[in-house]
Regions:
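A structured, charge-rich N-terminal accessory region that forms the first stable segment of a protein
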Residues: 2-83
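Short amphipathic alpha-helical segments
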Residues: 53, 57, 101-109, 158, ...
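A short, surface-exposed helix-loop junction/capping segment
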Residues: 80-98
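Acidic, metal/cofactor-coordinating or nucleic-acid-engaging core segments within structured domains
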Residues: 101, 164-259
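Extended, Lys/Arg-enriched charged tracts that mediate electrostatic binding to polyanionic substrates
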Residues: 101-131
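Loop-centered beta-sheet repeat module
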Residues: 120-183
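Short acidic, S/G/P-rich loop/turn micro-motifs used as interaction or catalytic elements
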Residues: 156-159, 228-233, 285
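Extended, charged low-complexity segments
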Residues: 234-301
């Protein structure tokens, strides 16, 4: 990517969800035995005493809704007109109309991809349905081809079941992915992105649009929010040791789940793409989803 294009990217195509999203989570260091292109990113929610801090993540997710429900072009116009409050209400209404049970997980994955991998959203499932993935993000790498990150997010009663389902989705969906030049027509770009962003995307992603178009590499990102209660025995431990003991329990659970699904995981070797896996445990992921939706309905009122 030429120097002038790198400057355009840094100035005109930033991720909308910034690093404060990550303040709701703690990354857990773990050495899990997967292939070199299968990257496990294991996080837990921040704590409030010896409980997960659902209030903090709930508040931050509300801030993320406009970036999930509205196009970049709409958001830019709102900022220019200083009408972000009105835009947030509109975004909440749009979000509540989405019937997919995975929409909160999709938004969490968008937060990780934008704040952790610095990969802005290109399109969502509601804008383009490409092979059954929930959306795509674009990651601009210095001196490398652009990466297109196809994302899918799920909730599950157990991590083991979630991993099995995610593998099934990848193996069915990846062969069906369509090329970007057939998906990103002029109408889509002009409707959803500013003029500067349209030029950047077309010149980098669509072959033949510019002399320095390199095409892109496919990459995958999976989010699984799953149930893993904080064990009662842990809450009677010393407060200073509690976080590390909790993480040991979570990591052990992940190791056991991945070992249990080892044969299925091995099937992914045929997929020629890096896969980023984001795993986050909840006490009750369905309860968290339901309570967050109810809080949004109150915001709307």
């Amino acid at each position: 990517v030429p120097l002038e294009m790198e400057e355009d990217l840094s100035n005109n195509f930033k991720a909308l969800i910034q690093s404060d999203f990550m303040e709701c989570f703690v990354r857990m260091e773990c050495d899990l035995n997967l292939d070199k292109n299968r990257i496990v990113n294991l996080y837990r929610l921040c704590l409030d005493g010896k409980k997960y801090n659902y209030v903090k993540i709930g508040e931050r997710l509300i801030d993320c809704i406009p970036s999930f429900s509205l196009s970049r072009k709409q958001l830019m116009r709102c900022r220019e007109r200083n009408a972000f409050g009105k835009a947030t209400l509109s975004a909440i209404r749009n979000f509540l109309k989405i019937e997919r049970k995975t929409k909160i997980s999709e938004m969490l994955l968008q937060g990780f991809l934008e704040s952790y991998l610095h990969a802005p959203k290109l399109y969502s499932f509601d804008e383009i349905n490409n092979a059954g993935f929930h959306g795509a993000h674009v990651k601009f790498n210095k001196n490398r081809n652009v990466e297109l990150i196809h994302s899918a997010a799920f909730i599950s009663n157990s991590l083991s079941d979630g991993v099995s389902y995610a593998i099934d989705v990848i193996l069915k969906a990846f062969p069906e992915l369509r090329s970007l030049d057939g998906l990103l027509g002029n109408t889509f770009l002009e409707t959803n992105f500013t003029e500067d962003e349209c030029q950047i995307l077309a010149s980098l992603l669509i072959p033949g649009e510019s002399s320095y178009s390199q095409g892109y590499e496919d990459r995958l990102a999976i989010f699984i929010g799953y149930n893993h209660k904080i064990e009662e025995s842990l809450i009677y431990e010393n407060a200073s040791r509690f976080p590390s003991l909790l993480e040991q329990k979570i990591i052990l659970n992940v190791q056991q789940a991945l070992e249990y699904r080892k044969e299925e995981i091995n099937k992914l070797s045929i997929v020629n793409a890096t896969i980023d896996c984001f795993f986050v445990p909840f006490d009750d992921v369905n309860k968290f989803n339901d309570e967050f939706i109810e809080s949004l309905k109150n915001e709307e009122d």
